Design a protein with these regions (language model features):
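Surface loop/turn signatures of beta-propeller and other carbohydrate-active proteins
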Residues: 128-165, 183-186, 200-220, 247-281, ...
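Beta-rich accessory regions
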Residues: 357-375, 381-595
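Surface-exposed, charged secondary-structure patches
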Residues: 16-18, 56-104
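Short beta-strand edge/turn micro-motifs at domain boundaries
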Residues: 1-6, 10, 88-90, 100-127
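A short gly/proline-enriched turn/hairpin at secondary-structure junctions
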Residues: 39-53, 66-69
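Short, low-complexity N-terminal intrinsically disordered segments enriched in polar/charged residues
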Residues: 1-42, 53-57, 74, 85
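Hydrophobic core segments of beta-strands in well-ordered, beta-rich domains
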Residues: 161-182, 205-207, 215-241, 258, ...
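Conserved Ser/Thr-centered positions that define the repeating blades of beta-propeller domains
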Residues: 196, 240-244, 297-302, 355, ...
Length: 595
């Protein structure tokens, strides 16, 4: 037989292989000796050395046995994998009154065009899955960029990786996230699902929300059942209802899409798009925000009723942002006596409005950003828990040259959970929930001490790529005061976090964080310290992620990619004036991700 490569793109070839196995099954149950013999290739050998020439006589002796005709070869779970001119079919289940098992049949197409068996062995499917899983895990565990306590995509590349559908339900935090695969025969977006009792150790659930799942949220319907309002790719905005308390099973409503149907002459015809929705129940009415450059509000008396547009989301514009700045990934909630609208725009990244929701419109009073330089902090999602805490996550994007598919084999990182509150100045306050303290170990304390002008002080005993720092310092005459992390001994690699007193900005400078082909941006967020006030930095380092919280009033998240194994140092520095460090506390943080 001449060697050839099979065109595996043709489904007919796979069907021909399976048809040969079905014919063998039928011949076995019928006691058809010639049909059974013909199934095997001339080169076939059994594990005991039986050849095709010996097989006919063997079968004649067995055919009158009481159970042979009751054997069944079941192909329900079998997959066909092609390797050159060999087709491996695995697992093939053998069912027999005297036992059974799972097998791999290796088939080849012979010169007459028929597919015949060249070998039979125990199924290797479980072994191959285990080997592949182990290989992936070992690769990921050795990846110096993969965060250990920020939630990351458990396997593969997720782009986008928006958090979605967050809800506190039956004592657990549930979080969904967008990912992509080809399980349905084509590349499609699904919602992965995890839950946790402590916000850091996550249990993975089966994927119950499949195909075309884009951004959306989760809320309780009139019956108190978790309900998601989401964008169904190719269909429009849609609804699904949970069928169990673990939120594993969902029913997509037959009434979807909920996108209102308008006609020429209707008041709202042609105004709005079906885009990133956010749904909720208010009294007896269901509402949904439809995102876009002209975001809309839709409503219905019933989830599966007729939805109609109520009109524009915004009652008016607000200083600092154009009225037509697109609203995507919206999240509307009450906080501190006001209403907050978290969202992104594709130009400004993560941002929020503070104002009032009344008369079926949002009346914004102020607007602020949560990403300033390159929109790498993206797609916010929040929930409220049993303690009344409003907790949000966001997607922290990889830099474009990360090499997710070719080098690292994964992509998808969420921010730390942030507990939100509203200050008297109308700006959000943000901090990490107290549950993270359970991950701390190896505490080191420093201070008080003075850092001379234009000097930096290494923090002996404080080093690592998985850290939490609490630094309290002041420098009345200094232009810059702050801390450097992931610093190499010679200073060639370092990430600088500091308060710029002249510009009144909190800055994270990544211009020396890694090689030239990694991000070099300086993220700068509005932040002002009044005279006599101390700078209080809370810094989280997690391999390629740095998150900074300043006085509970401002926060920055950045990706960094140090290349040197000795880039683990911590230094405190001051520029153009002395600084006094009142205290520095440091902890190592144990990973909460399994790998």
């Amino acid at each position: 037989m001449t060697e050839r490569t099979i065109d595996t793109s043709c489904a007919r070839v796979e069907e021909a292989v399976l048809a040969a196995l079905r014919a063998y099954d039928a011949a076995t149950r019928a006691g058809d000796i010639e049909g059974q013999v013909d199934f095997f290739a001339d080169s076939w050998r059994s594990s005991s050395g039986t050849t095709k020439a010996d097989l006919r006589e063997y079968l004649r002796k067995q055919v009158d046995g009481p159970t042979d005709r009751e054997k069944r070869f079941v192909l329900d779970d079998a997959e066909v994998v092609f390797d050159g001119d060999i087709a491996a079919v695995d697992p093939v289940a053998l069912r027999s009154p005297t036992g059974g098992g799972f097998f791999e049949f290796r088939m080849t197409r012979e010169s007459d065009g028929a597919w015949r068996c060249v070998s039979v062995a125990g199924s290797r499917r479980a072994d191959r899955l285990a080997e592949n899983t182990r290989e992936l895990r070992e690769r990921i565990l050795s990846d110096q960029a993969r965060p250990g306590y920020h939630f990351v995509m458990p396997e593969g590349v997720a782009m986008p990786f928006d958090p979605n559908g967050a809800i506190y339900w039956k004592g657990r935090y549930h979080l969904f996230y967008i990912f992509q695969d080809t399980r349905l025969g084509k590349r499609s977006d699904h919602w992965g699902h995890v839950s946790s009792s402590d916000l850091f150790h996550w249990h993975h659930h089966p994927t119950g929300l499949l195909e075309g799942m884009y951004s959306g949220n989760c809320f309780l319907n009139r019956e108190g059942v978790p309900t998601i309002c989401y964008h169904q790719h190719g269909l429009g905005n849609a609804m699904a209802v949970a069928l169990d308390n673990d939120l594993n099973e969902w029913k997509k409503l037959d009434s979807s899409p909920i996108t209102p149907q308008t006609r020429e002459g209707d008041e709202h015809h042609g105004k709005y798009r079906s885009w990133d929705p956010f749904g909720w129940r208010e009294g007896e009415t269901c509402y949904a925000i439809f995102g876009g450059k002209r975001p809309a509000v839709a409503k219905s008396p019933e989830l599966d009723g007729e939805w109609k547009y109520a009109g524009d989301l915004f009652a008016h514009g607000v200083e600092g942002v154009a009225i037509n700045e697109d609203v995507s990934c919206p999240d509307l909630f009450e906080l501190g006596g006001k209403h907050v609208l978290l969202c992104i725009s594709h130009r400004l990244g993560c941002r929020y409005y503070v104002g009032e929701w009344r008369d079926e419109q949002f009346h914004p009073e102020s607007h602020a950003r949560m990403s300033w330089v390159d929109n790498s902090f993206f797609a916010p999602e929040s929930l409220v828990d049993d303690r009344g805490r409003r907790i949000m996550w966001a997607w922290i994007l990889d830099e474009p040259l990360f090499g997710a598919r070719t080098k690292h084999g994964w992509s998808g990182t969420l921010s730390l959970p942030r507990v939100l509150s509203l200050g008297d100045d109308g700006l959000l306050r943000m901090d990490v929930p107290e549950e993270i303290e359970a991950l701390r170990y190896g505490e080191v304390r420093k201070g008080p001490f003075v850092v001379a002008a234009d000097e930096e002080v290494p923090m002996d005993g404080v080093a690592g790529n998985s850290l939490e720092l609490l630094v309290e310092m002041e420098g009345a005459e200094a232009s810059h005061v702050g801390v450097k992390v992931r610093a190499s001994p010679d200073g060639q690699e370092e990430t600088s976090i500091f308060y710029d007193a002249e510009a009144k900005l909190l800055k994270v400078d990544t211009s020396r964080s890694g090689p030239d082909d990694t991000p070099q941006a300086v993220e700068a967020a509005p932040f002002e310290l009044k005279p006599g006030k101390r700078l209080k930095l809370r810094v989280f380092v997690d391999k390629s992620v740095v998150e900074v919280f300043a006085n509970g009033r401002q926060a920055i998240a950045r990706r960094i990619y140090p290349s040197r194994p000795d880039s683990i140092g911590v230094r405190v520095f001051s520029a153009a004036g002395d600084a006094r460090v009142h205290s520095l506390k440091a902890w190592k943080i144990t990973p909460s991700n399994p790998y």
